[in-house]
Curated annotation (Swiss-Prot):
Sites bearing N-acetylmethionine, chain numbering: 1
Gene Ontology CC, one term: extracellular exosome
Keywords from the named record: Acetylation, Developmental protein, Isopeptide bond, Methylation, mRNA processing, mRNA splicing, Nucleus, Phosphoprotein, Ribonucleoprotein, RNA-binding, Spliceosome, Transcription, Ubl conjugation
Organism: Rattus norvegicus
GO MF, any single term: chromatin binding
UniProt keyword Protein biosynthesis, yes or no: no
Cell location: Nucleus
Composition-biased stretches (Basic and acidic residues): 61-80, 191-212, 238-271, 335-344, 377-388
Name of the protein in question: RNA-binding motif protein, X chromosome retrogene-like
Cross-link (Glycyl lysine isopeptide (Lys-Gly) (interchain with G-Cter in SUMO2)): 22, 80, 86
Disulfide bonds: none
Length: 388
Protein backbone atom coordinates (compact mmCIF):
# COMPACT_ATOMS: atom_id res chain seq x y z
CA UNK A 1 0.00 0.00 0.00
CA UNK A 2 2.84 2.31 0.77
CA UNK A 3 4.43 1.46 -2.54
CA UNK A 4 4.83 4.67 -4.52
CA UNK A 5 2.83 5.09 -7.64
CA UNK A 6 4.58 5.98 -10.84
CA UNK A 7 7.18 8.72 -10.36
CA UNK A 8 5.87 12.22 -10.70
CA UNK A 9 2.33 11.39 -9.55
CA UNK A 10 1.22 13.43 -6.57
CA UNK A 11 -1.72 13.07 -4.28
CA UNK A 12 -3.42 16.34 -3.49
CA UNK A 13 -5.75 16.15 -0.51
CA UNK A 14 -7.83 18.53 1.58
CA UNK A 15 -8.97 20.49 -1.43
CA UNK A 16 -11.84 22.90 -1.31
CA UNK A 17 -14.81 21.30 -3.00
CA UNK A 18 -14.97 24.36 -5.23
CA UNK A 19 -11.46 23.82 -6.55
CA UNK A 20 -11.51 22.32 -10.03
CA UNK A 21 -8.98 20.92 -12.49
CA UNK A 22 -8.29 24.30 -13.97
CA UNK A 23 -7.48 25.80 -10.62
CA UNK A 24 -5.17 22.90 -9.88
CA UNK A 25 -3.44 23.25 -13.20
CA UNK A 26 -2.97 26.95 -12.62
CA UNK A 27 -1.40 26.35 -9.22
CA UNK A 28 0.75 23.32 -9.99
CA UNK A 29 1.48 24.06 -13.63
CA UNK A 30 4.09 26.61 -12.67
CA UNK A 31 6.27 23.86 -11.14
CA UNK A 32 6.57 21.94 -14.37
CA UNK A 33 4.73 20.25 -17.15
CA UNK A 34 1.65 18.41 -15.93
CA UNK A 35 0.77 15.20 -17.72
CA UNK A 36 -2.51 14.51 -16.01
CA UNK A 37 -4.83 16.05 -13.45
CA UNK A 38 -7.35 13.68 -11.99
CA UNK A 39 -9.84 15.35 -9.67
CA UNK A 40 -11.85 12.80 -7.79
CA UNK A 41 -15.55 13.57 -7.91
CA UNK A 42 -18.65 12.07 -6.46
CA UNK A 43 -20.34 9.91 -9.04
CA UNK A 44 -23.83 11.09 -8.26
CA UNK A 45 -23.36 14.76 -7.51
CA UNK A 46 -20.26 15.18 -9.64
CA UNK A 47 -18.87 17.39 -6.90
CA UNK A 48 -15.24 17.32 -5.94
CA UNK A 49 -14.46 14.82 -3.21
CA UNK A 50 -11.65 17.04 -1.97
CA UNK A 51 -8.65 15.25 -3.41
CA UNK A 52 -6.95 14.85 -6.75
CA UNK A 53 -3.97 13.29 -8.47
CA UNK A 54 -1.60 15.45 -10.40
CA UNK A 55 1.02 13.76 -12.53
CA UNK A 56 4.09 15.70 -13.54
CA UNK A 57 6.22 14.76 -16.48
CA UNK A 58 9.33 15.12 -14.36
CA UNK A 59 9.58 13.32 -11.02
CA UNK A 60 11.88 16.09 -9.85
CA UNK A 61 9.13 18.64 -10.41
CA UNK A 62 6.73 16.50 -8.44
CA UNK A 63 9.16 16.37 -5.54
CA UNK A 64 9.50 20.12 -5.58
CA UNK A 65 5.74 20.53 -5.52
CA UNK A 66 5.35 18.10 -2.66
CA UNK A 67 7.99 19.95 -0.70
CA UNK A 68 6.70 23.44 -1.40
CA UNK A 69 2.94 23.00 -1.55
CA UNK A 70 2.33 20.52 1.23
CA UNK A 71 0.36 22.28 3.96
CA UNK A 72 -0.13 25.41 1.89
CA UNK A 73 -3.53 27.02 1.47
CA UNK A 74 -5.48 26.64 -1.74
CA UNK A 75 -8.85 28.30 -2.11
CA UNK A 76 -8.95 28.84 1.61
CA UNK A 77 -8.05 25.25 2.60
CA UNK A 78 -4.73 23.79 3.65
CA UNK A 79 -3.88 21.08 1.18
CA UNK A 80 -1.85 17.95 1.54
CA UNK A 81 0.60 17.18 -1.22
CA UNK A 82 2.60 13.96 -1.28
CA UNK A 83 3.83 11.24 -3.55
CA UNK A 84 0.83 9.23 -4.68
CA UNK A 85 0.78 5.65 -3.51
CA UNK A 86 -0.35 2.60 -5.40
CA UNK A 87 -2.93 1.85 -6.42
CA UNK A 88 -4.81 5.05 -7.09
CA UNK A 89 -5.42 7.14 -4.04
CA UNK A 90 -8.83 5.75 -3.56
CA UNK A 91 -7.80 2.19 -3.44
CA UNK A 92 -4.56 3.28 -1.89
CA UNK A 93 -6.29 5.01 0.91
CA UNK A 94 -8.56 2.10 1.42
CA UNK A 95 -5.56 -0.05 1.12
CA UNK A 96 -3.83 1.16 4.23
CA UNK A 97 -6.90 0.65 6.30
CA UNK A 98 -7.26 -2.83 4.93
CA UNK A 99 -4.01 -3.86 6.43
CA UNK A 100 -5.31 -2.82 9.79
CA UNK A 101 -8.51 -4.56 8.98
CA UNK A 102 -6.75 -7.69 7.95
CA UNK A 103 -4.71 -7.40 11.05
CA UNK A 104 -7.76 -6.66 13.09
CA UNK A 105 -9.55 -9.81 12.13
CA UNK A 106 -6.51 -11.83 12.94
CA UNK A 107 -6.45 -10.12 16.25
CA UNK A 108 -10.06 -10.84 16.69
CA UNK A 109 -9.43 -14.38 15.71
CA UNK A 110 -6.53 -14.55 18.01
CA UNK A 111 -8.52 -13.04 20.74
CA UNK A 112 -11.33 -15.33 19.93
CA UNK A 113 -9.06 -18.28 19.85
CA UNK A 114 -7.53 -17.16 23.05
CA UNK A 115 -10.94 -16.72 24.45
CA UNK A 116 -11.99 -20.05 23.17
CA UNK A 117 -8.95 -21.54 24.63
CA UNK A 118 -9.58 -19.91 27.91
CA UNK A 119 -13.18 -20.90 28.06
CA UNK A 120 -12.40 -24.44 27.20
CA UNK A 121 -10.07 -24.76 30.04
CA UNK A 122 -12.50 -22.93 32.12
CA UNK A 123 -15.22 -24.89 30.56
CA UNK A 124 -13.70 -27.94 31.98
CA UNK A 125 -14.22 -26.63 35.40
CA UNK A 126 -17.51 -25.17 34.75
CA UNK A 127 -18.75 -28.13 32.87
CA UNK A 128 -17.84 -30.42 35.57
CA UNK A 129 -19.30 -28.02 37.96
CA UNK A 130 -17.30 -28.39 41.05
CA UNK A 131 -16.04 -31.65 39.84
CA UNK A 132 -13.64 -30.64 37.29
CA UNK A 133 -12.33 -28.25 39.79
CA UNK A 134 -12.18 -31.07 42.17
CA UNK A 135 -10.51 -33.15 39.63
CA UNK A 136 -8.00 -30.52 38.97
CA UNK A 137 -7.47 -30.10 42.57
CA UNK A 138 -7.44 -33.72 43.10
CA UNK A 139 -5.18 -34.20 40.17
CA UNK A 140 -2.92 -31.41 41.26
CA UNK A 141 -3.17 -32.55 44.77
CA UNK A 142 -3.49 -36.06 43.67
CA UNK A 143 0.23 -36.47 43.65
CA UNK A 144 0.39 -35.09 47.10
CA UNK A 145 -2.29 -37.39 48.27
CA UNK A 146 -0.36 -40.13 46.68
CA UNK A 147 2.68 -39.11 48.55
CA UNK A 148 0.60 -38.88 51.58
CA UNK A 149 -1.04 -42.03 50.46
CA UNK A 150 1.84 -44.26 51.42
CA UNK A 151 1.75 -43.08 54.98
CA UNK A 152 -1.96 -43.43 54.91
CA UNK A 153 -1.52 -46.98 53.88
CA UNK A 154 0.56 -47.67 56.89
CA UNK A 155 -1.35 -45.15 58.91
CA UNK A 156 -4.63 -46.48 57.75
CA UNK A 157 -7.87 -44.60 57.88
CA UNK A 158 -6.48 -41.41 59.38
CA UNK A 159 -4.08 -40.80 56.57
CA UNK A 160 -6.77 -41.51 54.13
CA UNK A 161 -8.82 -39.03 55.80
CA UNK A 162 -6.10 -36.53 55.69
CA UNK A 163 -5.47 -37.22 52.09
CA UNK A 164 -9.03 -36.84 51.09
CA UNK A 165 -9.25 -33.93 53.38
CA UNK A 166 -6.84 -31.97 51.28
CA UNK A 167 -8.67 -32.47 48.08
CA UNK A 168 -11.82 -32.78 49.94
CA UNK A 169 -11.42 -29.50 51.58
CA UNK A 170 -10.95 -27.81 48.38
CA UNK A 171 -13.87 -29.57 46.93
CA UNK A 172 -15.73 -29.43 50.16
CA UNK A 173 -15.33 -25.71 50.05
CA UNK A 174 -16.99 -26.02 46.75
CA UNK A 175 -20.00 -27.54 48.17
CA UNK A 176 -18.85 -30.92 48.95
CA UNK A 177 -20.12 -30.26 52.37
CA UNK A 178 -23.33 -28.84 51.31
CA UNK A 179 -23.84 -31.78 49.11
CA UNK A 180 -22.90 -33.90 52.01
CA UNK A 181 -25.31 -32.37 54.39
CA UNK A 182 -27.83 -32.57 51.71
CA UNK A 183 -26.73 -36.05 51.02
CA UNK A 184 -27.42 -37.05 54.54
CA UNK A 185 -30.74 -35.43 54.67
CA UNK A 186 -31.71 -36.54 51.28
CA UNK A 187 -29.59 -39.55 51.65
CA UNK A 188 -32.84 -41.15 52.27
CA UNK A 189 -32.45 -41.83 48.63
CA UNK A 190 -34.83 -40.30 46.18
CA UNK A 191 -34.68 -36.99 47.98
CA UNK A 192 -31.02 -37.09 47.67
CA UNK A 193 -31.38 -37.96 44.15
CA UNK A 194 -33.48 -34.92 43.56
CA UNK A 195 -30.90 -32.63 45.01
CA UNK A 196 -28.29 -34.43 43.10
CA UNK A 197 -30.29 -34.42 40.04
CA UNK A 198 -30.17 -30.72 39.86
CA UNK A 199 -26.44 -30.74 39.96
CA UNK A 200 -26.12 -34.10 38.55
CA UNK A 201 -28.38 -33.11 35.79
CA UNK A 202 -26.16 -30.23 35.14
CA UNK A 203 -23.11 -32.30 34.77
CA UNK A 204 -24.52 -35.68 34.54
CA UNK A 205 -27.69 -35.14 32.74
CA UNK A 206 -26.10 -36.61 29.72
CA UNK A 207 -24.44 -39.17 31.80
CA UNK A 208 -27.47 -39.72 33.87
CA UNK A 209 -29.31 -40.62 30.79
CA UNK A 210 -26.47 -42.81 29.83
CA UNK A 211 -26.49 -44.32 33.19
CA UNK A 212 -29.76 -45.56 34.09
CA UNK A 213 -27.49 -46.58 36.84
CA UNK A 214 -27.25 -43.09 37.92
CA UNK A 215 -30.85 -42.89 38.57
CA UNK A 216 -30.80 -46.21 40.20
CA UNK A 217 -27.76 -45.42 42.01
CA UNK A 218 -28.99 -42.26 43.07
CA UNK A 219 -30.41 -45.21 44.75
CA UNK A 220 -27.23 -44.82 46.45
CA UNK A 221 -23.98 -46.12 47.20
CA UNK A 222 -22.61 -47.76 44.32
CA UNK A 223 -24.73 -46.12 41.88
CA UNK A 224 -23.86 -42.96 43.56
CA UNK A 225 -20.36 -43.98 43.33
CA UNK A 226 -20.93 -44.13 39.73
CA UNK A 227 -22.24 -40.66 39.84
CA UNK A 228 -19.29 -39.64 41.66
CA UNK A 229 -17.36 -41.52 39.21
CA UNK A 230 -18.87 -39.47 36.54
CA UNK A 231 -18.12 -36.30 38.22
CA UNK A 232 -15.30 -36.97 40.40
CA UNK A 233 -13.44 -40.08 39.78
CA UNK A 234 -11.44 -39.63 42.92
CA UNK A 235 -14.47 -39.18 44.98
CA UNK A 236 -15.78 -42.26 43.45
CA UNK A 237 -13.01 -44.23 44.81
CA UNK A 238 -13.51 -42.85 48.18
CA UNK A 239 -17.13 -42.86 47.80
CA UNK A 240 -17.21 -46.39 46.75
CA UNK A 241 -15.34 -47.55 49.63
CA UNK A 242 -16.56 -45.09 52.03
CA UNK A 243 -20.06 -45.06 51.25
CA UNK A 244 -20.23 -48.63 50.48
CA UNK A 245 -19.77 -48.80 54.16
CA UNK A 246 -21.74 -45.90 55.32
CA UNK A 247 -25.01 -44.92 53.87
CA UNK A 248 -24.33 -41.33 54.70
CA UNK A 249 -21.24 -41.62 52.70
CA UNK A 250 -23.31 -42.94 49.96
CA UNK A 251 -25.25 -39.81 50.09
CA UNK A 252 -22.29 -37.78 49.44
CA UNK A 253 -21.04 -39.98 46.78
CA UNK A 254 -24.27 -39.79 45.07
CA UNK A 255 -23.69 -36.12 45.16
CA UNK A 256 -20.50 -36.62 43.50
CA UNK A 257 -19.20 -33.42 44.77
CA UNK A 258 -19.49 -34.50 48.19
CA UNK A 259 -17.59 -37.46 47.20
CA UNK A 260 -14.43 -35.86 47.89
CA UNK A 261 -15.78 -33.67 50.41
CA UNK A 262 -17.93 -36.37 51.66
CA UNK A 263 -15.22 -38.83 51.77
CA UNK A 264 -12.91 -36.25 53.12
CA UNK A 265 -14.67 -34.49 55.85
CA UNK A 266 -18.26 -35.19 55.34
CA UNK A 267 -17.58 -38.70 54.82
CA UNK A 268 -15.60 -38.74 57.90
CA UNK A 269 -18.55 -37.49 59.75
CA UNK A 270 -20.81 -39.85 58.04
CA UNK A 271 -18.18 -42.36 58.70
CA UNK A 272 -18.26 -41.56 62.32
CA UNK A 273 -21.93 -42.10 62.33
CA UNK A 274 -21.40 -45.38 60.68
CA UNK A 275 -18.56 -45.80 63.07
CA UNK A 276 -16.61 -48.89 62.41
CA UNK A 277 -18.04 -49.19 59.00
CA UNK A 278 -16.70 -45.84 58.03
CA UNK A 279 -13.36 -46.80 59.31
CA UNK A 280 -13.51 -50.00 57.48
CA UNK A 281 -14.37 -48.14 54.43
CA UNK A 282 -11.49 -45.91 55.06
CA UNK A 283 -9.26 -48.77 55.64
CA UNK A 284 -10.54 -50.50 52.65
CA UNK A 285 -10.22 -47.29 50.87
CA UNK A 286 -6.76 -46.91 52.19
CA UNK A 287 -6.01 -50.40 51.13
CA UNK A 288 -7.39 -49.82 47.78
CA UNK A 289 -5.46 -46.72 47.78
CA UNK A 290 -2.32 -48.43 48.66
CA UNK A 291 -3.06 -51.05 46.09
CA UNK A 292 -3.49 -48.48 43.41
CA UNK A 293 -0.34 -46.83 44.53
CA UNK A 294 1.41 -50.04 43.81
CA UNK A 295 -0.09 -49.70 40.47
CA UNK A 296 1.31 -46.32 40.02
CA UNK A 297 -1.08 -43.76 38.72
CA UNK A 298 -3.61 -44.65 41.29
CA UNK A 299 -1.27 -43.46 43.94
CA UNK A 300 -2.70 -40.12 43.68
CA UNK A 301 -5.84 -41.46 45.09
CA UNK A 302 -4.98 -44.77 46.35
CA UNK A 303 -8.33 -46.22 46.59
CA UNK A 304 -8.57 -44.40 43.57
CA UNK A 305 -7.26 -47.33 41.80
CA UNK A 306 -10.57 -47.11 40.30
CA UNK A 307 -10.50 -43.49 40.42
CA UNK A 308 -7.24 -43.38 38.70
CA UNK A 309 -8.61 -45.50 36.04
CA UNK A 310 -11.47 -43.21 35.76
CA UNK A 311 -9.55 -40.13 36.02
CA UNK A 312 -7.06 -41.24 33.51
CA UNK A 313 -9.58 -42.80 31.33
CA UNK A 314 -11.83 -40.00 32.06
CA UNK A 315 -9.40 -37.39 31.12
CA UNK A 316 -8.64 -39.29 28.03
CA UNK A 317 -12.10 -40.35 27.12
CA UNK A 318 -14.53 -38.13 28.82
CA UNK A 319 -17.92 -39.77 28.65
CA UNK A 320 -16.80 -43.17 27.58
CA UNK A 321 -14.56 -43.06 30.50
CA UNK A 322 -17.50 -43.13 32.79
CA UNK A 323 -19.03 -46.18 31.35
CA UNK A 324 -15.80 -47.88 30.82
CA UNK A 325 -14.47 -46.91 34.13
CA UNK A 326 -17.62 -47.97 35.81
CA UNK A 327 -17.66 -51.42 34.39
CA UNK A 328 -14.01 -51.77 34.40
CA UNK A 329 -13.44 -50.12 37.66
CA UNK A 330 -16.01 -52.28 39.25
CA UNK A 331 -14.54 -55.46 38.02
CA UNK A 332 -11.08 -54.31 37.92
CA UNK A 333 -11.07 -52.44 41.12
CA UNK A 334 -12.75 -55.21 42.95
CA UNK A 335 -10.42 -57.81 41.57
CA UNK A 336 -7.50 -55.60 41.69
CA UNK A 337 -8.08 -54.21 45.08
CA UNK A 338 -8.33 -57.65 46.46
CA UNK A 339 -5.26 -58.71 44.65
CA UNK A 340 -3.44 -55.64 45.74
CA UNK A 341 -4.52 -56.22 49.26
CA UNK A 342 -3.53 -59.78 49.25
CA UNK A 343 -0.24 -58.97 47.63
CA UNK A 344 0.39 -56.43 50.23
CA UNK A 345 -0.72 -58.84 52.77
CA UNK A 346 -2.96 -56.22 54.21
CA UNK A 347 -4.66 -57.26 57.36
CA UNK A 348 -7.68 -59.40 56.78
CA UNK A 349 -9.66 -56.72 58.44
CA UNK A 350 -8.63 -54.33 55.79
CA UNK A 351 -9.11 -56.93 53.19
CA UNK A 352 -12.37 -57.69 54.69
CA UNK A 353 -13.43 -54.12 54.93
CA UNK A 354 -12.38 -53.42 51.47
CA UNK A 355 -13.99 -56.28 49.69
CA UNK A 356 -17.34 -55.74 51.19
CA UNK A 357 -17.59 -52.36 49.70
CA UNK A 358 -16.23 -53.70 46.53
CA UNK A 359 -18.45 -56.67 46.37
CA UNK A 360 -21.46 -54.89 47.49
CA UNK A 361 -20.57 -51.93 45.53
CA UNK A 362 -19.59 -53.76 42.47
CA UNK A 363 -22.63 -55.91 42.62
CA UNK A 364 -24.79 -52.98 43.35
CA UNK A 365 -23.21 -50.95 40.66
CA UNK A 366 -23.81 -53.70 38.22
CA UNK A 367 -27.10 -54.78 39.61
CA UNK A 368 -28.24 -51.55 41.01
CA UNK A 369 -28.07 -49.62 37.87
CA UNK A 370 -30.36 -52.10 36.29
CA UNK A 371 -32.09 -53.47 39.32
CA UNK A 372 -33.03 -50.40 40.89
CA UNK A 373 -30.13 -49.68 42.79
CA UNK A 374 -31.57 -48.50 45.94
CA UNK A 375 -32.93 -51.69 47.22
CA UNK A 376 -30.25 -53.76 45.63
CA UNK A 377 -27.43 -51.64 46.73
CA UNK A 378 -28.74 -51.47 50.20
CA UNK A 379 -29.24 -55.14 50.52
CA UNK A 380 -25.90 -55.64 48.94
CA UNK A 381 -24.38 -53.30 51.29
CA UNK A 382 -25.99 -54.78 54.28
CA UNK A 383 -25.28 -58.24 53.03
CA UNK A 384 -21.75 -57.33 52.24
CA UNK A 385 -21.15 -56.02 55.64
CA UNK A 386 -22.64 -58.88 57.48
CA UNK A 387 -21.05 -61.23 55.08
CA UNK A 388 -17.62 -59.88 55.58
Amino acid sequence: MVEADRPGKLFIGGLNTETNEKALEAVFGKYGRIVEILLMKDRETNKSRGFAFVTFESPADAKDVARDMNGKSLDGKAIKVEQATKPSFESGRRGPPPPPRSRGPPRGLRGGSGGTRGPPSRGGYMDDGGYSMNFNMSSSRGPLPVKRGPPPRSGGPPPKRSTPSGPVRSSSGMGGRTPVSRGRDSYGGPPRREPLPSRRDVYLSPRDDGYSTKDSYSSRDYPSSRDTRDYAPPPRDYTYRDYSHSSSRDDYPSRGYGDRDGYGRDREYSDHPSGGSYRDSYESYGNSRSAPPTRGPPPSYGGSSRYDDYSSSRDGYGGSRDSYSSSRSDLYSSGRDRVGRQERGLPPSMERGYPPPRDSYSSSSRGAPRGGGRGGSRSDRGGGRSRY
